[in-house]
Amino acid sequence: MQSAKFKSVNNKVDFVQLEHEMLAKWEKHTIFDRLRKKNKGGEPWSFLDGPITANNPMGVHHAWGRTLKDIFQRYHAMQGHELRYQNGFDCQGLWVEIEVEKELGFKSKRDVQEFGLEKFVNACKDRVHKYSDIQTEQSKRLGYWMDWDNSYFTMSDENNYTIWAFLKKLFNDDK
């Protein structure tokens, strides 16, 4: 019996280079856009990405979660479903505020008042935008397909007004 011969492979694979080559190939051939076009009009399947907080670069646990979410979306895309691919960023105040307070060297909430509430809120928003950009690039490097130009932010006026309207309705309905 003759044994099978396999082509030699390099045992020092540059995975980062391979990753960049694959991402460049997808971009060059507009693979994601072609998939969306192919599935347009298919049965809708919606997946709301439970957002990670845009407060620091992604951790390995975020990458793991995003990879699992991507598997579900790719499966449904392969079934011909039309997907929204909407990414989100959680802008919850507490964790962002804590990091901004550290950056500014604040020791108490009184420091925030002295600094100025509006300036502090703007510093928090700037941090969210900085890290949402970083997380977007990290997610793209994972091969995570999303409509990156239409990500939602929990700090958006639309989101806040919707929450306030909902809370008002609950209050008015006495529930």
Stretches with model-predicted labels:
Residues 2-175:
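N-terminal, positively charged nucleic-acid-binding surface of large information/translation enzymes
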